[in-house]
Amino acid sequence: IQSLGSNLLYVTPENPNRDGEIVNPSVQELTVDDAIALNDPVRAPDIAGAAPERRTAVTCTSEDRSHSTQIVGTWPSFFSITNSPVSAGAYFNNADELSARRITVIGSTVAESLFPESDPLGRQIACNGVPFTVVGVQAEKGGAFANPDDVVIAPLSAVENSITGYGEVSAISVQASSSETTDDAEGQAIAILDERHGTTEGTRDFEVFNQASLLDTA
């Protein structure tokens, strides 16, 4: 988690209706439009970037090898926001997102499982039967918290088109402009989402985590 950077925030859906008590009768999911709103430099001057994530479990295959993992559909800015460099190859870009290209950056665990003795770059993997071409391998992050190396990352548009369908997103990664502005960025994110979702403290259908709270959760 520490490798993600002290200026990372993570927004996830949260249902405030617990134990049979209806606190918010109109709970909303997180959407791509929420991520777009968080990128507003006027409303959120201390947010450097925000990227939606659509995550789902998949089984990926290459020739006679198979590996169960999760695919993350997201924007190109995800890599810089989450401090996720590649050790080989390249990232996908905005043109790839706009054209819904079926290309992927795979984590080191996936690379070792599907291509133990060969270079994965340029090779094709099928995730739930959908072909993706490997253009990059994410640098190893390590750690036992949700194994960040066991992942397949692809353009959000491609994942929605071919695997998940369209709708809500699983989370939004948010990068504050610096570690010193993380609290301000968190406040700006909450204010924007409160306005969009019609919520207040106690009825929020989302939760914002910072690095400290993520470490407590782990």
Language model features: what each stretch is:
Residues T59, G122-A126, E207:
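Residue-level detector of beta-strand face positions
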Residues T69, F132-T133, F206:
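Small-residue-enriched segments and motifs
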Residues S77-F92, A100-E201:
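Mid-to-C-terminal secondary-structure elements
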Residues A189, T200-A218:
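Peri-transmembrane interface segments
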